[in-house]
Each structure stands twice: as structure tokens, then as C-alpha cells.
Amino acid sequence: GDVYKRQDMRYPEIAELTCMSLFQYLPYASEKAFEWMADDREYFQLCGFMLMARLLMKGNQLTERSEAEFLDQAMATLQSEGVLPRKAAATALKKFAVQSKENGKKVNRLLAPLAKSDKVEIASLAGEIKLETEYWH
């Protein structure tokens, strides 16, 4: 996975397609998702959150420890400057939140302060995630 990202991950569309059609099938996909989400490089974070979103869409469940790590990374990324990782983190949070009512409540509790953010793009993303969560529950 790292080899692909070092070479041609200059466009978000390529990153998305690669996550959806290749990375999700790796036996170590979950480990890579966490590694990439924690990376400081924009396209690594983008791939990490996209991959996590895909794994969650497939029904993968997180352990208590991995859930805490995921939520921590996603919330930090939502407040970061990188637009692409921020949107990918929001997508992954949506997929996590709609897995169960309990997950939805956890995410909405974490998002409550962000919904009141002075930064319009952050407040908007928080509202978008909340709406999608409420729609599915």
C-alpha cells in the first residue's frame, strides 16, 4: 500500500479509487488505515480515513481501544487545516455513526462543541455528520 501512495497519490480521485478497489482487500487493511490516519502527510491521512470509511461500510466493527483511537484521530483531523483529510474524516465518522444508535450518540456527543465552532467549514461538517446520523436512526 505504501508503495502506491509514494508514487501516484497526487489526486484525491486516485486515492479514493485505490482505497475502494485495492486497499480494502489487503489482509492488513485495518492496521494500514490506523497507521495512515495518524500520519502527518495529507494524502496518507486521506487514504487512512477513506480506507476506514470503506471498512466500516463493509460492517467491520472496532474494538473499544481501536474505536477510541479512531474517534480521537477523526476529531483532531476535523479541526485541522487539511481540507481533504477533514472531509475524509467526516465520511469515516458518518460510516461509524450509522453502524448503531450507540455509535451515533457517541459521535454526536463529540461533535456538539464543533457544531458551535467559529470556523464555518468545521461547524458545517459537524452539522452534516449529525444530520446523516439522525437520518439513519
Model-derived features with residue positions:
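Histidine/lysine/aspartate-rich catalytic loop segments that bind and position anionic ligands
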Residues: 14-15, 24-76
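Short coil turns that connect the paired helices of HEAT/ARM alpha-solenoid repeats
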Residues: 7-10, 38-42, 76-84, 113-121
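Short conserved catalytic/interaction loops centered on acidic-Pro-aromatic/His motifs
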Residues: 60-67, 83-88, 99-108
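Short, small-residue-biased leader/transition segments that mark boundaries at the very start
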Residues: 1-4
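Eukaryotic acidic, Ser/Thr-rich intrinsically disordered low-complexity regions
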Residues: 100-137
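Amphipathic alpha-helical segments within well-ordered protein domains
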Residues: 6, 20, 33-34, 75, ...
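Structural detector for internal amphipathic alpha-helices that build alpha-solenoid repeat scaffolds
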Residues: 14-25, 46-60, 87-99, 124-132
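Alpha-helical scaffold repeats of the Armadillo/HEAT/TPR superfamily
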Residues: 7, 65-73, 106-117
